[in-house]
From Swiss-Prot:
GO molecular function: nickel cation binding; zinc ion binding
Signal peptide: none
Gene3D superfamilies referenced in this protein's UniProt entry, alphabetically: 3.30.2320.80
PROSITE patterns to which the protein is assigned, alphabetical: HYPA
Biological process according to GO: protein maturation; protein modification process
Protein name per its UniProtKB record: Hydrogenase maturation factor HypA
Cysteine-cysteine disulfides: none
Length: 115
């Protein structure tokens, strides 16, 4: 489960940001998870709830925003948001497409409680 190592890195980032902003706690953590990121949201949530104990994010709520796959066709130029996980252009049927979004995971925002 690579979600554990992802959460450990996420918590390090959260701790650093909280320290830089003199926050006594973090109340909300918002992450964006692309459907092709390889991250399983339920496993990420479980890992977050396990590892946040004893950190500045101990009482934080984790909000996960799932980002759909978005592609651009290199033949016809059409940009498409895909419901299914395939790279076929719905405009011309080409497989000559490029991923625009939906393959990353990143920290989107934090809600901090400061002194």
């Amino acid at each position: 489960m690579h979600e554990f190592s992802i959460v450990q890195s996420l918590l390090t980032l959260i701790e650093d940001y909280a320290r830089e902003n003199n926050a006594k706690s973090v109340t909300k953590v918002v992450v964006s998870i692309g459907v092709l990121s390889g991250v399983e949201p339920h496993l990420l949530e479980m890992a977050f709830n396990t590892f946040k104990e004893g950190t500045v994010a101990e009482k934080a709520e984790l909000i996960m925003e799932i980002e759909k796959l978005k592609i651009k066709c290199m033949d016809c130029g059409k940009e498409s948001e895909k419901e299914e996980l395939n790279m076929l252009c719905p405009g011309c049927g080409s497989l000559n497409t490029q991923i625009i979004s939906g393959q990353d995971m990143f920290l989107k925002s934090l809600e901090l409680e400061v002194d």
